[in-house]
């Protein structure tokens, strides 16, 4: 999941617009299958033969005066229905979309920005072979040593961050084949890079602050959408204080019931425990209503994975991101602290989609 599972649903409106102008045969996209293992470093890069893809980094930062901040950087690549053999440089074969957000309790609400462009002309791209995505002056680049460099010059803030791995990538699901529903095609290729060490600077109101912290990066690509009865999803990526990492998600139906779920807990030695759909439960503990959209979000969430109980508490209530100018979605994406069985355990991010209105798949 992450920017969880089928963000393709958010892009359907854009894709339908571009496909409506096409008279040639639409391209045939690759399908996700369980028999294809992830291969690094190739799979750090883009996969243009699949319909949709995203790179998603979130984390907690700390300023020199110990002030906590949360950050989100997401780049989407989405293939249109244009004929791939069309030689025109102006044919919009791929769209690049980016979101960035800063969660600062001193501001009292989420600061966020978004961009959209068709790939091409060196202004927007997602390259194959290694992570290198760009949209105007926004970029996320992975070096051969695994370090990521992010530069985001947003409307209300600037991020200049390095994200350095401390662990190997964490393939989700069955070796990177991540089920999102009961049907085998309801799946994505998906891996995470938890426990990234972060250093750099954040600029607010023209003033730069040094920051350090810990981040989580997800990379996911797919072609098929979710179950047609799906309305949204809840997802969490948690860096635990002992070096472990927890990923959990559920897909919700239009009536609110769980359609699918999965969780994975990797300890610091690399051993992974997977949890089946019936072993994962998301239970809202407290809600917050947006004064802008009137959407109500379960911003404090309890997650059960097997015998363990995780309590997620938001850094601040107002972490709603309105991306109707790019992906068409309104969602809640927030920094959270985490307790495990009543004890302080870590920090991470919680994503809540489909609460403003059900996703149109």
Residue map of PLM features:
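Structured soluble/peripheral alpha/beta segments that form catalytic or ligand/cofactor-binding pockets
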Residues: 25-361
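Bacterial N-terminal signal peptides
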Residues: 8-21
């Amino acid at each position: 999941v992450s920017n969880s599972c089928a963000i393709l649903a958010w892009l359907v409106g854009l894709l339908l617009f571009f496909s409506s102008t096409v008279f040639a045969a639409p391209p045939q996209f690759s399908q996700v299958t369980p028999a294809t293992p992830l291969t690094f470093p190739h799979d750090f890069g883009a996969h243009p033969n699949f319909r949709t893809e995203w790179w998603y980094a979130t984390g907690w930062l700390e300023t020199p005066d110990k002030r906590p901040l949360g950050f989100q950087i997401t780049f989407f690549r989405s293939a249109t229905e244009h004929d791939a053999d069309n030689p025109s440089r102006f044919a919009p074969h791929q769209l690049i979309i980016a979101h960035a957000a800063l969660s600062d309790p001193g501001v009292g609400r989420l600061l966020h920005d978004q961009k959209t462009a068709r790939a091409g002309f060196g202004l927007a791209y997602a390259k194959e072979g290694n992570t290198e995505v760009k949209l105007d002056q926004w970029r996320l680049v992975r070096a051969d040593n695994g370090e990521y460099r992010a530069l985001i010059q947003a409307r209300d803030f600037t991020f200049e961050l390095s994200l350095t791995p401390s662990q190997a990538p964490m393939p989700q699901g069955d070796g990177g084949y991540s089920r999102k529903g009961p049907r085998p095609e309801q799946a994505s290729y998906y891996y995470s890079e938890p426990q990234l060490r972060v250093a750099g600077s954040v600029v607010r109101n023209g003033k730069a602050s040094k920051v350090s912290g810990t981040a989580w990066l997800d990379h996911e690509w797919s072609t098929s959408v979710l179950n047609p009865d799906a309305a949204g999803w809840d997802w969490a990526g948690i860096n635990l204080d002992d070096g472990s990492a927890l990923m959990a998600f559920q897909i919700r139906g239009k009536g609110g019931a769980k359609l699918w779920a999965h969780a994975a807990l990797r300890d610091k030695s690399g051993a992974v425990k997977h949890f089946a759909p019936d072993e994962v439960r998301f239970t809202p503990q407290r809600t917050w209503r947006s004064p802008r959209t009137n959407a109500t979000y379960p911003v404090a969430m309890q997650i059960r994975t097997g015998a363990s109980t995780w309590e997620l508490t938001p850094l601040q209530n107002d972490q709603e991101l309105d991306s109707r100018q790019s992906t068409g979605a309104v969602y809640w994406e927030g920094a959270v602290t985490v307790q495990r069985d009543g004890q302080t355990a870590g920090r991470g991010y919680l994503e809540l989609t489909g609460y403003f209105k059900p996703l149109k798949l």
